[in-house]
Amino acid sequence: MVEFSLAWVACNDGTGRMKTVGIAVWGGWWWWAMFLAVAPVLADGPAPTEAESGTSGFAQSGEVKIHYVTRGQGPLVVLIHGFPDYWYTWRRQMPALSESFQVVAMDQRGFNRSDQPEGVEQYSMEKLVGDVRAVIRHFGQDKAVVVGHDWGGAVAWSFAMTHPEMTDRLVILNLPHPNGLQRELATNPEQQRNSAYARNFQKPGAASQLTAEGLARWVTDPAARTNYVEAFQRSSFEGMLNFYKANYPREPYTLPVSEGPKVKCPVLMIHGLNDRALLPGALNDTWKWLEKDLTLVTVPGADHWVQQDAADLVTRTMVAWLRR
């Protein structure tokens, strides 16, 4: 069965306002948007193994070592995973991206081979953003394309807002802008119900309920699932849940007090519409919090892990957008 995605492009109209368009002019900035609007979600081929994916290394972020896998040469692209996940979530995107870029897929602190400091305060957004900054500096670069999924998306949003000079472009997968999520938590009963898992993760003792096998249940590829179980066995369950304890909004949910700084670089968002944890209503009005172009690609039939559910489409979308 062939499914179709729809690309919406929000661009600055030259007056400081944003307008939304659904088509593009061939040969112009947005020539590829029309192609994406009818691009089928194709069946995915075999994924590279961990060993085939790239070269492993470590960057120092304060007292914490951050593990990464890198391949390719060119401008730097930093890939940031979410929960429960690790760098290998990008295995289907890394080969194509590395043809034009140096791709660095990092393990966030607490996960897999990165250090796992103790204490909720060690997982503040400031610390997580600092890890991305350290990775970019480790490769001798002043800026990078920053790509994030789930919690990696939250870190990427925050990095772009606090380090605009280091953010070339921003790619976000299945993670609304923080203002959009907070608005939905405050006003949308369905989002409140669907966020019960996050409230449970914030409770004392929640980590004792987790197992590596349980965290890997969503992985459909048997070979990859084995890798995931091993990665989660190396991880800190307390560290994983500290992302929620340190950064996820708590009840009573309220509207954002401050919208924060606007993102100053172009943004690509890709969102699988079957995601029940992060409902698509939170995507509304994202353009209000950006200074430049927003391209939003929604993917029917794809779940929360859109980079794996619709790997071919996500890869081609990212490559086309980054090469424009």
Residue ranges of predicted features:
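Conserved HGGG/HGGXW glycine-rich cap/lid loop of the alpha/beta-hydrolase fold
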Residues: T70-R113
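Catalytic histidine-centered segment of alpha/beta-hydrolase-like enzymes
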Residues: A302-A310
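Bacterial N-terminal signal peptides
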Residues: G27-P40
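Mature N-terminal segment immediately following signal peptide/propeptide cleavage
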Residues: G57-G72
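Extreme N-terminal basic, low-complexity initiation segments
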Residues: V2-F4
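Positively charged n-region of N-terminal signal peptides that target proteins for export
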Residues: M18-A24
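Flexible "cap/lid" subdomain of the alpha/beta-hydrolase fold that forms the substrate-access gate
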Residues: G45-S53, V64-I66, L76, V104, ...
